[in-house]
Amino acid sequence: MSYYAFEGLIPVVHPEAYVHPSAVLIGDVIVGAGVYIGPLASLRGDYGRLILEAGANLQDGCIMHGYCDTDTIVHENGHIGHGAILHGCVIGRDALVGMNSVIMDGAIIGEESIVAAMSFVKAGFVGAPRQLLVGAPARVKRDVTDEELHWKRLNTQEYQDLAVRCRASLCETQPLTQVEKNRPRLKGTTEVKPKSA
């Protein structure tokens, strides 16, 4: 694992969280129970405090950072998709930030909201609960439906379960030289399917 103390501040990681060995946590970082942090995520707490509350996930290649005297927070069950950047912002409880989105300083994403993939949320934006935000710059398109929130929650549950599965079985290995006969397929833990347009 890549954990670094910075000016006496050491990352805090709950024993029931999972942090991929290639992720980097520096300084003032606090990770709660059941959190999943994916490969190559960078949490650079060398200025502001970075907080991932219980059940949140920060997927592959995500970046968290913020200015001094600010907290960048992903609240409980927050879901941060691959490649997203969070800088000095607050992500509400049970909200989703889509892949490769950018959330800027002082922005607040309301609880149970969804930020569509590739969106850019400007500094200082203050959202309400259950908003669907789309575009660059992101604009409120409509309210999040019950169906969309259910889909989001299934995906978040998958990552909470993945944290447990990774703690139990993920290990470094050497590749095989050929595909074995009857190679099994991995399965998730919920009935979630990719969202269609």
From Swiss-Prot:
Q: Which GO terms describe its biological process?
A: carnitine metabolic process
List keywords of the entry alphabetically.
Repeat, Transferase
Entry's Gene3D superfamilies?
A: Hexapeptide repeat proteins
Q: In which pathway does it act?
A: Amine and polyamine metabolism; carnitine metabolism
| InterPro entries membership | CaiE, Hexapep, Transf_Hexapept/Carb_Anhydrase, Trimer_LpxA-like_sf
Q: Which GO terms describe its molecular function?
A: transferase activity
Residues of the signal peptide: none
Q: Which PANTHER family match?
A: DYNACTIN SUBUNIT P25, GAMMA CARBONIC ANHYDRASE-LIKE 1, MITOCHONDRIAL-RELATED
Family (UniProt): Belongs to the transferase hexapeptide repeat family.
Functional note:
Overproduction of CaiE stimulates the activity of CaiB and CaiD.
- Protein name stated in the entry: Carnitine operon protein CaiE
Its source organism is Citrobacter koseri (strain ATCC BAA-895 / CDC 4225-83 / SGSC4696)
